[in-house]
Every structure is written in structure tokens, then in C-alpha cells.
Curated annotation (Swiss-Prot):
Effect of H311A: Reduces oxygenase activity 38-fold
One GO CC term, this protein: monolayer-surrounded lipid storage body
Residues annotated to bind heme b: H162, H382, R479, R483
Reactions it catalyzes: a 1,2-saturated fatty acid + O2 = a (2R)-2-hydroperoxy fatty acid; (9Z,12Z)-octadecadienoate + O2 = (2R,9Z,12Z)-2-hydroperoxyoctadecadienoate; hexadecanoate + O2 = (2R)-2-hydroperoxyhexadecanoate; (9Z,12Z,15Z)-octadecatrienoate + O2 = (R)-2-hydroperoxy-(9Z,12Z,15Z)-octadecatrienoate
Protein name: Alpha-dioxygenase PIOX
Cofactor(s) listed in the protein's UniProt record: heme b; Ca(2+)
Effect on the protein of changing R559K: Reduces oxygenase activity more than 100-fold
Family: Belongs to the peroxidase family.
Top-rank taxon: Eukaryota
């Protein structure tokens, strides 16, 4: 297809990439581009919206999956010898034993943009103070609660953490904002840069967590950690009599990933320890002769699949609350034929009709599986956390609004790290979960970043506290620059999205425009990614920006279809019949909570999803 013929129809900034596409890719691009120019795809009937999303995903899979580092194609193995998830993530991809394992490179969704000369431009302290720091708290209404905020942090503890360098660097707040900063300066470890020893991208960063959706926030990322969490009886994990995580003498929780956590993540880790142990009991009842190791492996597979399913068809559906996205996310799991057909007849057809889960073989689209730098960047969602938690009484009588009575307000800053574990032990699971369920989380917008994160005690890998506090808001701005993630406008171009020409294209908020202009001038190319994601006009029903959503489109599907335990090995032979039935009958977090705390759901959860505020009538 001649590029010249269609040149007037393509945005000038996207003509170069368009000209290099194949004939059929150009057709697909023109289709989505027509909707993008009119901001239409989310306003059209569901079938057309699904066609748009599938076309966009297909293009992103072709142009926005970049390998970093050499692929270990020589490390072949027999998948039948590894019908279980290894602790460090190895031996999942039959053609690349190392793919997705601990201490392998983050991939890329776009070529890196070196910003070593612009690490402090504009100053991260200024950006954090003038554009991110919370002023008047904004929440998400009934759509999304604090459990939903904790859930995505629970997932991040499963997916990704960058290896740090041993040395430290420091940054100091300029005089213009120093008096408004909780910390006037702070020290931190830079991200460790490693040579990739390959063509293409020369420098990369290691992910010290396993990139697979393998429940490593519960199980750990290596054998050393996993061994400390097991009872070695009937496949079970250690858990306190109170249903909370156990702790070492120094107060550090015993769980898969405990670094830089808070009480909200801890209760989800504890809940899924109970889920794992319940799966062990159920499978043992059907197979009484299984060993401890066999029960553990089966239960880990089942529990990891439950977590992935909850995220796919429950959490994401509430995050992106539109009819089209509900259909799209359910299609990822069940296919367009739907749950009844799939549960009755199994996987039929390809990924569209039958879904990504249960495909005959995994598909990594020719690029070794990993999570990416850009994926990390769009998951910077600390503004979801409110400043205070209204503690509610699960044993009390409903108040005038038919809600559990409030006991007190707790500063969520006191629920972070080791202090948070102490608080949680006094509060208990039921009270904590109920309180988080009944309270809306923060909105992902400008001026909504919690103040306690700007004076935060970071932790070492073993969960112990470091001596130097950090300003997390300023550090997050710095991290994207340090890791060569393109700034907002270029980020959009690389995703085939129409870039902004002025601040008015970004937002209609006059105060935001004035403040952004004061910091970045009129140069829209300087806008930091995090600021753009928070400032961007949102699609109705979306709790996140459309720009971030495009990374979701690509990577949410990839986490399922590249993993053989969600594709070729998603079967009774690998999971057991009871295990498969367990996954099939779990449709959301509500089901998991109901399994272990039925009195909470029966008395207090009126919403259909545990991620909506629990008194919501939907």
C-alpha cells in the first residue's frame, strides 16, 4: 500500500512508522487511527469496540515487544519433567528455560530514550511538590475501594522489582520548594545497569522477582525464600492462628515478598495462604496418597491461576468499568463463546473464540517473555492510597446507612512497613478487610499523591528498614528518566496514539495547565510520563489513563498467553481434576473471601465485586 495515498489520513507524527508497516498492518493502523482521531472507540457498540481493541493489540504485539539481552535458546528441556511452577520461574517456556525467571532482564515496549543529561530537568522535587503532592483528597466513588488499591500492589509484589546498585546518590530540593518538601534531600540506590551483550538494546536492568504470574508474592522468588514459608505437612504454608502472616523476631512478615509493603498487601498475602492451604485439603481428599511436595505444587498452580483469574475478570473489569472492557477481559479468559461453552466443552477455536487461557501452546510473539520497563512505569499508582482508613466494626450493628459502624480514623502512614504489621496484628483480618472494602480508594489524578510516601522508610530485600528516608514521589519521576523510559508525548507516539500539541490537549483543568506550564514551559515534549498519566483526560468509567491502558492491552494478554501453565498445561493432568474445578468455580475475589470468611460477605458485602465499595448496588 503506497504511503503517499493515505498520507493525509495519518497524523504527521505517525507517518514515518506507518510508512514502514506491511500492507495488512497499514490497514489495521488506519482502522484504529480513524477512531483515535475522533476519540470514538469507547463510545461505539461493544462488537466494534472489541474489534478496535483486538486490532490495536495485534499491532502492539508486532511492534511493541522488544527483547533485552540474549535469549538462551540452547537451554531446552522436556516440559513433562516440569509440570509445576519452579520457585525461581525457570523451565516455563520450553524454548527458553531462563525466560521470566528471577534476575533476568526487563524487556521493553519501545526503544529507550537516553535522558542522562536530563535526569534533573525539571527538578523531581519541583514536579513532586507542585504537581503530585496531595492537596485535597480525591477518591474514585463507589467504583474502586482500598482493597482494589492493595490488590494492584499485591500484583506488583508478584511481578517486578529492579535490582539496585550498591552505591548511593542523593538529590536536594531547590530553594523554591524546599519549605514544602517533607525531606529537603534524600539518598537512594540507583538502578543497576547491566550490559546485555547482545545486538540492539545495549544496557538493561534485572528484575529480581519472577515475571510470570506465579503468585510469588505468596510463595517467594527462589527456593531459599520458599523453604521458609512451608510447613512440609500436606503441602501447606505457614499462617498464624489469627489468619494473619507469621513474623520473625524482628517483626518482618513471613511471606513471599515483604519488601516495601503495607497492611493492605499483607492481608491479601494471608488470604491467599489460606486459599493455598484449602486447595491442599481439597486435593488431598481426592488423592490421599499424594506427597507433601506434590500437594504443594498442585496448590501453587491452582492458587496462582485463581489470582490471575481474579485480576483478569474481576479487578480489571472494575478498574475499566465499561461494557466493552467487561466483554474484552472475559474474552481474554473465556473467549467470545463465553464461560458456559468453555466450562462444558473446553477450549474451542483460537484465542478469539476460546480465549487465551487453554490455548494448545503458549505464544510469546517471537520475543522471550518478560515484563517491561514501560509496564513498570504505568503501574505507578500510589495515589490510589488514601490518607486515612476508617476502621469499622464487623461485629457491630448496621448504622443509619446500613453500613458497619466506624470506630476510628487511622493514619495509613502508620500502616506501612514494620509499623503496619504491628497495627494489623491488633486490628485483625476481618476488621481490616471490612474497612478497606467499605472505603473508596484515591483517584489517579494530579495533586493526590499521599504525603506519607514523601517521607518514607524504604526497606532492604529482607524486609528490614533502611536508615535513609526517601521522597517516593520525586524518586518515581527520577526512576522513569533514569531507566530511559520515553516522556509522555513520545510514549504516546510509540504506542501509535496521537500526541498532544498543547497542554489543553492533555487536560481541561485550568489550574493544572497553569502549573504544568510554570514547570515545563510550553514544551510538551518535556512532560514527564507520570505527570501526563495523572493529568490526562480519562475515558468515562476508566480509573486509569488511556495511555497507560495501551500497555495494559498488550501486557495483560501476554501474561496469560506466553505462560504454558495458562495454555498448553492448563489441564487436569497438570492441575488435577479438583484443581481445575476450583479455578473454574472462582469468578472473583468475593468468592475467595467468602470461602474463608463467609460471615463477612453474608453480612456486609452488598456489591457484586469485592473491589467495588461494598455498599455499592452493582
Amino acid at each position: 500500500m503506497g504511503s503517499g495515498l493515505f498520507k493525509p489520513r495519518v497524523h504527521p507524527d505517525l507517518r514515518d512508522v506507518f510508512s514502514k508497516m506491511s500492507f495488512f498492518d497499514k490497514i489495521g493502523f488506519l482502522f484504529i487511527h480513524a477512531f483515535d482521531k475522533r476519540n470514538l472507540w469507547h463510545k461505539v457498540p461493544v462488537p466494534i469496540g472489541l474489534l478496535y481493541l483486538n486490532t490495536r493489540r495485534t499491532l502492539l504485539e508486532k511492534y511493541n515487544l522488544l527483547a533485552v539481552g540474549r535469549s538462551s535458546h540452547g537451554a531446552l528441556f522436556d516440559p513433562k519433567e516440569f509440570l509445576y511452577r519452579t520457585e525461581d520461574g525457570k523451565y516455563n517456556d520450553p524454548h527458553n528455560a531462563e525466560a521470566g525467571s528471577q534476575n533476568t532482564f526487563f524487556g521493553r515496549n519501545m526503544e529507550p530514550v537516553d535522558q542522562q543529561d536530563e535526569l534533573m530537568s525539571p527538578d523531581p522535587f519541583v514536579v513532586a511538590t507542585k504537581l503530585l503532592a496531595r492537596r485535597e483528597y480525591k477518591d474514585t466513588g463507589k467504583q474502586f475501594n482500598i482493597l482494589a488499591a492493595a490488590w494492584i500492589q499485591f500484583m506488583v509484589h508478584d511481578w517486578m522489582d529492579h535490582m539496585e546498585d550498591t552505591g548511593q546518590i542523593g538529590i536536594t530540593a531547590p530553594k523554591e520548594v524546599a519549605n514544602e518538601c517533607p525531606l529537603k534531600s534524600f539518598k537512594f540506590h540507583p538502578t543497576k545497569e547491566l550490559p546485555t551483550n547482545s545486538d540492539g538494546i545495549k544496557i538493561g536492568h534485572y528484575n529480581i522477582r519472577t515475571a510470570w504470574w506465579d503468585g510469588s508474592a505468596v510463595y517467594g522468588n527462589n527456593e531459599e525464600r520458599a523453604e521458609k514459608l512451608r510447613t512440609y505437612v500436606d503441602g501447606k504454608l505457614v499462617i498464624g492462628d489469627d489468619g494473619l502472616l507469621l513474623h520473625k523476631e524482628n517483626g518482618v512478615a513471613l511471606s513471599g515478598d515483604i519488601r516495601n509493603s503495607w497492611a493492605g498487601v499483607s492481608i491479601l498475602q494471608a488470604l491467599f495462604v489460606k486459599e493455598h492451604n484449602a486447595v491442599c485439603d481439597a486435593i488431598k481428599e481426592e488423592h490421599p496418597n499424594l506427597s507433601d511436595e506434590e500437594l504443594y505444587r498442585y496448590a501453587k498452580l491452582v492458587t496462582s491461576a485463581v489470582i490471575a483469574k481474579v485480576h483478569t475478570i474481576d479487578w480489571t473489569v472494575e478498574l475499566l468499568k465499561t461494557k466493552t472492557m467487561r466483554a474484552a477481559m472475559r474474552a481474554n479468559w473465556y473467549g467470545l463463546l463465553g464461560k458456559k461453552i468453555k466450562d462444558t466443552f473446553g477450549h474451542i477455536g483460537g484465542p478469539i473464540l476460546g480465549g487465551l487461557v487453554g490455548l494448545k501452546k503458549p505464544n510469546n510473539h517471537g520475543v522471550p517473555y518478560s515484563l517491561t520497563e514501560e509496564f513498570t512505569s504505568v503501574y505507578r499508582m500510589h495515589s490510589l492510597i488514601p490518607s486515612t482508613l476508617k476502621l469499622r466494626d464487623p461485629t457491630g450493628q448496621p448504622d443509619a446507612n446500613n453500613s458497619p459502624p466506624c470506630l476510628e480514623d487511622i493514619d495509613i502512614g502508620e500502616m506501612i512497613g514494620l509499623k503496619g504489621e504491628e497495627q494489623l496484628s491488633k486490628i485483625g483480618f476481618e476488621k481490616q478487610a471490612l474497612s478497606m472494602g467499605y472505603q473508596a480508594c484515591g483517584a489517579l489524578e494530579l495533586w493526590n499523591y499521599p504525603s506519607f510516601f514523601r517521607n518514607l522508610i524504604p526497606q532492604n530485600l529482607d524486609g528490614t528498614n533502611r536508615s535513609d528516608r526517601i521522597d517516593l514521589a520525586a524518586l518515581e519521576v527520577y526512576r522513569d528518566r533514569e531507566r530511559s523510559v520515553p516522556r509522555y508525548n513520545e510514549f504516546r507516539r510509540r504506542l501509535f496514539l496521537i500526541p498532544i500539541k498543547s497542554w489543553e490537549d492533555l487536560t481541561s483543568d485550568k489550574d493544572a495547565i497553569e502549573t504544568i506550564r510554570a514547570i515545563y514551559g510550553d514544551d510538551v515534549e518535556k512532560l514527564d510520563l507520570l505527570v501526563g498519566l495523572m493529568a490526562e483526560k480519562k475515558i468515562k468509567g476508566f480509573a486509569i489513563s488511556e495511555t497507560a491502558f495501551n500497555i495494559f492491552i498488550l501486557m495483560a494478554s501476554r501474561r496469560l498467553e506466553a505462560d504454558r501453565f495458562f495454555t498448553s498445561n492448563f489441564n487436569e493432568e497438570t492441575y488435577t481434576k479438583k484443581g481445575m474445578q476450583w479455578v473454574k468455580t472462582t469468578e472473583g475475589l468475593r468468592d475467595v473471601i467468602n470461602r474463608h470468611y463467609p460471615e463477612i460477605t453474608a453480612k456486609w458485602m452488598k456489591s457484586s465485586s469485592a473491589f467495588s465499595v461494598w455498599d455499592a448496588d452493582y
